[in-house]
Amino acid sequence: MTRKYVIDAYAWVEYLIGTQAGAKVAAVLEKEDVEVYTCAVTVAEVVSKAAREGQDVDLVYDILVRNSQVVNVDEEISKEAGVLHAEMRKTSKDFGLADAYALTIARRTKSKVLTGDLHFK
C-alpha cells in the first residue's frame, strides 16, 4: 500500500540542515512505496528562509521539487485553507496560514503531514 505524506516547511528545513528530525524526512524520501507532496506555499516559505540565511536558493528549490510533487494552490484550496486557518486560530493563536495550506493539501490527498510543528500534534 502506498503511503502519502505532505511535508511542511518545518520538516523540509530540518531535512535540509541535517538534524535528527530531518533524518525522519530522509527515511520517508528513501522509501519506494510513498507519494510525497509539498504545497507551493511551503516551497515559498523554505526558499525564503534559505534566501534570508544566504543559502543556495536554487539548490534548495531543486531539492524540494525533485523529491516531492508540488501542489499549486487555486481559489478553492485557498478558500478551504482560509476557513481552516480561522477555525484553528480559535484554539491555537499562532497557527500559521501556511500550516493551513499544508493541512488542506493533506486532507485533499488523504496524506499524513510530516512535520515537527507542535500545531499538528
Stretches found by the model and what they are:
Residues 22, 43, 61, 78-81:
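A general structural signal for well-ordered alpha-helical segments in protein cores
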Residues 7-8, 38-39, 95-96, 117:
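Histidine- and aromatic-rich ligand-binding microenvironments
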Residues 2-3, 32-36, 67-69, 107-112:
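Short active-site oxyanion
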Residues 12-13, 43, 78, 120-121:
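A generic structural signal for short hydrophobic patches within well-formed alpha-helices
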Residues 54-77:
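Short hydrophobic interaction/assembly module
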Residues 1-38, 49-62:
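Short, well-structured N-terminal submotif of metal-dependent ribonuclease cores
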Residues 70-116:
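Active-site neighborhoods of divalent-metal-dependent phosphate/nucleic-acid chemistry enzymes
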